[in-house]
From Swiss-Prot:
Membrane topology, from the record: Peripheral membrane protein
Composition bias, Basic residues: 651-670
UniProt entry keywords in alphabetical sequence: Membrane, Nucleus, Phosphoprotein
One GO CC term on file: nuclear inner membrane
Localization: Nucleus envelope; Nucleus inner membrane
Protein name: Soluble lamin-associated protein of 75 kDa
Domain of life according to the entry: Eukaryota
Species this protein is from: Homo sapiens (Human)
UniProt record similarity statement: Belongs to the FAM169 family.
Post-translational modification Phosphoserine, affected residues: S350, S379, S449, S515, S615, S618, S635
Comp. bias intervals (Polar residues): 358-375, 460-470, 558-569, 579-591
Residue ranges, compositional bias (Basic and acidic residues): 414-423, 479-494, 504-514
Biased composition (Acidic residues): 378-387, 442-453
């Protein structure tokens, strides 16, 4: 029986294609209800226009085509070809009836080209190609190829790119040496040295000193090369693994590639278990093929990883050695090095840690004093004690920083004093006389303050003990206004009737305050007394540390009850023609208080009673504080810190809140 390869020895491509066209014309004119059928392994496939089509015989070349029959379940796999005016199954196309076709035979006839197409495009790609293998392209009509025939059947092939032939990947470049491009052997014939036979035939067919094998090596090529070097150890420099067209930088010896693959296979065998055998093919060929396939897959993956690592290492090394040009950069735009910048940041953070903490607490206390308006004397002075205590805790560490805010607040206070003096208006003869008297008193106070300033300037600020001794001056100087505040509160609403008495009383208060100066200086001797007074009677006016330092440098008379003034301004809002803004961050001088006393206030009897009760409660509580302070002087500073009368302060706060009058409208002092 003749097979297509035997029948098409003298047939041309045009004759084959014309025969297929005639068949398609008959199929179009045929009866669709009674189609022709093709029998294949007990399966009958109906032949219709829906499952018949032309396919290119040489891949990308569309000029030569053959007619193929596709299975209904797979429209991409041909099950038969129309050759020599009839349909032939795939298994019959690769057979021959000529006994002379044995071994490797070079492809020359159209029938042999059809056999090569079936082996490559249908049997290998659709039936026997492994997942890790790369499919071969369809051979062209001029490719050098040989088919291996065994007992009347084609079992494999190999193809070669001769020297000087055009590379499909590089259209303008030609191969520098003969390259074994493809090699295929059917699975049931593997393990019988057919691969070695094809490699030996390739070496014998070309006489060049260097022969190439296409990268990457398939499992069949790997096995064949290993057997070849075992049989011919003197040909180690003959075979090269080639990429591209085979320039000197695109090739490595195959022996080195085999060593690399052997190491990878050994590593994979130690780390990964072997895959189970399928048993689908022959028992002798399947185990060897499976092992070789696994080795080839791992070797290809590892080759890719190694190439990527080498490229990355070379790139990173080049970057490390390359120096960045700084010619176009100016000196002020250069950034410090990372290590230097890190050290500087650590040094600056450790150096400014204490300053940041103290400045944060002082700023918070000052902002709180500036943002809150004090409605009454007795309630607000205790609400401000907590930020004031935090400010005094940092007094020992930051006496120099406290002096700067004090110096800044002095010109602000002088500015306010000047503004308020410009707003004075003559009410009557008596009021002008009182203002003259108060101006004389303020001159005396200014002289006293100058003496105190000279004494304070002589004291260095670098001693924490000296800066702490300034606290008793503020603490004791704030006590007489608190004691005298109840006397002034009920007299202020009746200022038109009792103005002379208020002025004389104020002079008496100033004399008492001046007489207290020797006693204050006497308390500066011991640091324990200073700690005691600073813990118990610290800043009844509720000012932060910066304001306390200012009090120590200003005259004692300027500490006269600013809270009383603000509360009186709230109560007497109806009698004031212009809006007045209350200054809670800075103390008011006695001259400002006289101005407010000159303004007529209106107050009902209920408010008088409430103010009297507040003054009584505050006087009682201050007496208790005075007694506790005298007891504390005899004891140590540690015991005094435990005996801080926190409960009494809370009671006083509750009393002050309970005696608040009705809601009052607040006026800003200009």
């Amino acid at each position: 029986m003749a097979f297509p390869v035997d029948m098409l020895e003298n047939c041309s491509h045009e004759e084959l294609e014309n025969s297929a066209e005639d068949y398609m014309s008959d199929l179009r004119c045929g009866d669709p209800e009674n189609p022709e059928c093709f029998s294949l392994l007990n399966i009958t496939i109906p032949i219709s226009l829906s499952n018949v089509g032309f396919v290119p015989l040489y891949g990308g070349d569309q000029t030569q085509k053959i007619l193929a029959l596709f299975a209904p379940e797979d429209s991409l796999t041909a099950v038969a070809l129309y050759l020599a005016d009839q349909w032939w199954a795939i298994d019959d196309i690769v057979k021959t009836s000529v006994p002379s076709r044995e071994g490797l035979k070079q492809v020359s006839t159209l029938g042999e080209r059809v056999v090569l197409y079936v082996l490559n495009r249908i049997i290998y790609r659709k039936q026997e190609m492994e997942r890790n293998e790369i499919p071969f392209l369809c051979h062209s009509s001029t490719d050098y190829a040989k088919i291996l025939w065994k007992k009347g059947e084609a079992i494999g092939f190999y193809s070669v790119k001769p020297t000087g032939s055009i590379c499909a990947s590089f259209l303008t470049q030609s191969y520098q040496l003969p390259v074994l491009d493809t090699m295929f052997l059917r699975k049931k014939y593997r393990g019988k040295d057919f691969g070695l036979h094809m490699l030996e035939d390739f070496v014998d067919s070309f006489t060049e000193d260097a022969l190439g094998l296409r990268y990457p090596l398939s499992s069949l090529m790997y096995t064949a090369c290993k057997q070849y070097f075992e049989k011919y150890p003197g040909d180690h420099e003959l075979l090269w693994e080639v990429e591209g067209v085979g320039h000197w930088y695109q090739r490595i010896p195959v022996t080195r590639a085999l060593q690399r693959e052997a190491l990878k296979i050994l590593a994979l065998s130690q780390n990964e278990p072997k895959r189970p055998m399928s048993g689908e093919y022959g028992p002798a060929s399947v185990p060897e093929y499976e092992a070789r396939t696994e080795d080839n897959q791992s070797s290809e993956m590892q080759l890719t990883i190694d190439s990527l690592k080498d490229a990355f290492a070379s790139t990173s090394e080049g970057h490390d050695k390359t120096s960045v040009s700084t010619h176009t950069r100016s000196g002020n735009l250069k950034r410090p090095k990372i290590g230097k910048r890190f050290q500087d940041s650590e040094f600056s953070s450790s150096q400014g840690e204490d300053e940041k903490t103290s400045q944060t607490s002082l700023t918070a206390s000052i902002n709180k004093l500036e943002s809150t308006a004090r409605p009454s004397e007795s309630s607000e002075e205790f609400l401000e004690e907590e930020p004031e205590q935090r400010g005094i805790e940092f007094e020992d560490e930051s006496s120099d920083r406290d002096a700067r805010p004090a110096l800044e607040t002095q010109p602000q206070q002088e500015k306010q004093d000047g503004e308020k003096e410009s707003e004075l208006e003559p009410m009557n003869g008596e009021i002008m006389d009182d203002s003259l008297k108060t101006s004389l008193i303020t001159e005396e106070e200014d002289s006293t303050s100058e003496v105190l300033d000279e004494e304070l300037k002589l004291q260095p600020f670098n001693s924490s003990e000296d800066s702490t001794n300034l606290v008793p001056l503020v603490v004791e100087s704030s006590k007489p206004p608190e004691v005298d505040a109840p006397d002034k509160t009920p007299r202020i609403p009746d200022s038109e009737m009792l103005m002379d008495e208020g002025t004389s009383d104020e002079k008496g208060h100033m004399e008492e305050k001046l007489s207290l100066l020797p006693r204050k200086k006497a308390h500066l001797g011991s640091s324990d007394n200073v700690a005691t007074m600073s813990n118990e009677e610290r800043s009844d006016g509720g000012f932060p540390n910066s304001v306390i330092a200012e009090f120590s440098e200003e005259p004692v008379s300027e500490n006269l009850s600013p809270n009383t003034t603000s509360s009186l301004e709230d109560q007497g809002e109806e009698g004031v023609s212009e809006p007045q803004e209350t200054s809670t961050a800075l103390p008011q001088s006695s001259l400002i208080e006289v101005e407010l006393e000159d303004v007529p206030f209106s107050q009902n009897a209920g408010q008088k009673n409430q103010s009297e009760e507040q003054s009584e409660a505050s006087s009682e509580q201050l007496d208790q504080f005075t007694q506790s302070a005298e007891k504390a002087v005899d004891s140590s500073s540690e015991e005094i810190e435990v005996e801080v009368p926190v409960v009494d302060r809370r009671n006083l706060r509750r009393k002050a809140k309970g005696h608040k009058g009705p809601a009052k409208k607040k006026a800003k002092l200009t």
